Regions:
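Bacterial Sec-dependent N-terminal signal peptides
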Residues: 22, 26-57, 61
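Boundary/entry segment of secreted carbohydrate-active catalytic domains
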Residues: 53-106
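Catalytic domains of carbohydrate-active enzymes, especially glycoside hydrolases
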Residues: 90-127, 206, 210-212
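Glycine-rich, aromatic-flanked loop segments that form ligand/cofactor-binding clefts
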Residues: 131-184, 214-224
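Polysaccharide-binding and catalytic clefts of secreted carbohydrate-active enzymes
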Residues: 181-371, 375-380, 395-399, 403
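Catalytic-core region of carbohydrate-active enzymes that cleave or remodel glycosidic bonds
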Residues: 344-470
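Carbohydrate-binding surface patches
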Residues: 458-459, 515-562, 599
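C-terminal beta-strand-rich structural cap/linker in extracellular carbohydrate-active enzymes
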Residues: 584-605
Length: 605
């Protein structure tokens, strides 16, 4: 997420974990503004606009077919991209201002892709003159896929100076007033507003015109965040005219046969609330006065209260974790209606004007993307039962706790992507910033920063997840070069870009068989490739301020028939190494002579 606009996630202050708003303001000033912009590029803080009663002009009609739950939303086949992703193996994260020269680290490292090289923020990036479009040309000439992008919901007052235009796009609370996020000095745009979606689409079209390979969208589902003093993320946002009109259509689509008496008995909806489901599918429910309903029942200050029977129909959002099949309005429409419209329109623009396919991705796990790009931050719900995963584990004395495996978390990301999208698309991850994960990473000694990547890049790849190596952000944090990481990143890139190596991490299938090793603290996963080779991935978690090399490790894993050969592949070896093996009882048995950080044992039938 660009600079500091990712600070708040539901229920958690995300400035370096749990910093206060005062510290946030100081951090913004110290770092020269948001998204790396200098303070001269940003307008002075603006107070909330004068009281007004209209926010986010609604669409003229319900979605095609009348709307409703996910089974009722029409999905245009054109929303899916067709560009090849099979050569995207090495991801490097470098984000900078749009007008700067190319990041020399990117060109020196030469990853397959930079998934968010630019991210439009406020008015920086709304005009072609804001961009150095030579940068994507340089990247592409070096074989690097260049992804630009924008915040999807952070809205500054100066983006729409005219009050009428601002009111047509801004998200509101249950009293009908725009929600001012005072810590960040912005509002949220309403994705339900066709005018706001067109604004985002126009920015994407401009970047496509500049020759980028694709677009990254940040905070796609944050229009429902909410903000009141002392309780950021209370969910009191998104109750604007556009969302409410769609909510009425959603209710009528979901329950088309309810009588007025049933609406009243189940939800307390009366004739005064103007929910008219007898109209044609295109317009049914769109006159629903949900804010009036909330006011009449005393729920304006807490619209998601359990006392409100419609709160369960409205739903709640965990940023970057949409649930389009959960049967709620926000779960369904944010992903399947609003996000689909943006992705489809931009894909068709590139197809019709330039005869090309573009990549589209977003921060989190979303449908309709070419690949997922998941930000890693603290307080996430990524673990079992919604528990938080620590993506940069520390020991009590502040060192890297390399004994901790992230393999299960990476596997869960891939599984979630398949569930939400319905297809198997590549899954990438990056250390989001500024977050406690980034803070913990930056606090590591230089050698342990290096070890972090040596351990967790291959552990992610073992799950067929692509972990971005961090080059630069717009916070003024130390770059990879300043941290002494460029030699490692260049060597790692060269190793995994080698076609015979890259092939081990695409079109894989996780196998249920168990990999056994003669030593403890070895992370392992067994995969099968499309050519039927079997790969046993071994990650060494014997670690204490450095890898504890394991020699002579006995390893066994199941394969259907005796292999023709077994080869060891590792960035810690000088070259791929043929290995003697035995086969009996459906098990391949080998002895790995040296396991430093990672070894792939490749069995070829």
């Amino acid at each position: 997420m660009p600079a500091l606009n990712l600070i708040f996630r539901p229920g958690r202050n995300r400035v370096f974990g749990r910093a206060c708003s005062l510290f946030l303001a100081v951090a913004i000033a110290r770092c020269g503004g948001l998204s790396g912009q200098t303070s001269t590029n940003l307008p002075p803080p603006s107070p909330p606009p004068a009281t007004q009663s209209t926010c986010a002009t609604p669409a003229a009609s319900n979605p095609v077919g009348g709307g409703g739950t996910y089974t009722q939303i029409a999905i245009d086949p054109g929303v899916y991209g067709k560009r090849d992703t099979s050569e995207l193996t090495v991801f490097g994260f470098s984000q900078q201002d749009q007008n700067l020269p190319a990041d020399p680290q990117v060109l020196a490292m030469s990853p397959n892709i930079v998934p968010r090289a630019w991210a439009r923020w406020d008015r920086s990036g709304v005009q072609p003159s804001d961009y150095n479009f030579d940068y994507p040309k340089q990247a592409q000439a070096a074989g690097i896929t260049f992804i630009a992008g924008t915040t999807a919901t952070a809205l500054f007052r100066d983006e729409f100076p005219a009050a009428s235009k601002f009111n047509a796009v801004v998200s509101c609370d249950a009293t009908g007033q725009p929600v001012f996020h005072s810590a960040m000095k912005f509002y949220r745009g309403s994705l339900a507003s066709p005018a706001y979606r067109q604004y985002l689409i126009g920015i994407g079209e401009m970047q496509i015109d500049g020759g980028v390979d694709g677009l990254f969208f940040d905070e796609v589902d944050f229009s429902y965040q909410g903000a009141i003093s002392g309780n950021e993320d209370n969910g009191d946002e998104g109750f604007d005219d556009a969302d409410i009109a769609d909510f009425g259509g959603f209710l009528c689509g979901k329950y088309p046969n309810y009588s007025p008496a049933e609406w009243q008995s189940k939800y307390g909806i009366t004739a005064a609330d103007n929910l008219n489901c007898s109209k044609p599918a295109a317009t049914r429910g769109r006159t629903f006065n949900y804010r009036g309903y909330l006011a009449r029942n005393g729920w304006q200050a807490s619209p998601l209260t359990a006392s409100n029977p419609l709160a369960a129909e409205w739903g709640t959002i965990i940023g970057g974790h949409p649930e389009p099949q959960n049967g709620t309005f926000t779960g369904t429409y944010t992903s399947l209606v609003y996000w689909q419209d943006i992705a489809l329109t931009l894909r068709n623009y590139a197809r019709q004007k330039y005869k090309k396919e573009i990549y589209i991705t977003a921060n989190g796990v979303f449908p309709f993307v070419d690949f997922q790009t998941i930000g890693l931050w603290g307080g996430n719900p990524d673990g079992p039962g919604g528990s938080s995963v620590n993506y940069c584990p520390h020991t009590a004395d502040g060192h890297l706790d390399g004994k901790q495996s992230l393999l299960a978390a990476f596997m869960a990301m891939k599984q979630r992507s398949a569930r939400i999208d319905g297809r198997v698309v590549p899954v990438a991850a990056f250390i989001d910033w500024p977050t406690d994960v980034m803070t913990d990473y930056l606090s590591l000694p230089s050698s342990e920063k290096s070890d972090y990547w040596r351990m967790y890049v291959p552990e992610a790849l073992a799950a067929t997840v692509y972990l971005n190596m961090h080059l630069a952000d717009t916070m003024g944090d130390p770059t990879a070069k300043q941290s002494g990481l460029m030699p490692l990143f260049q060597q790692t890139t060269a190793f995994y870009k080698m076609p015979t190596h890259a092939a081990l991490y695409h079109n894989t299938r996780d196998l249920p068989g168990r990999v056994t090793a003669s030593v403890a603290n070895i992370g392992a996963n067994l995969t099968q490739l499309s050519d039927e080779r079997t790969v046993a991935h071994l990650i060494n978690h014997n670690y204490s301020q450095g890898f504890q090399e394991q020699d002579g490790v006995s390893v066994s894993f199941p394969v259907a028939k005796a292999p023709r050969s077994v080869t060891l592949v590792s960035p810690d070896y000088r070259a791929d190494t043929p290995l003697a093996f035995t086969y009996s009882g459906g098990q391949v048995r080998v002895t790995v002579p040296k396991l430093v950080a990672y070894v792939a044992v490749v069995s070829e039938n």
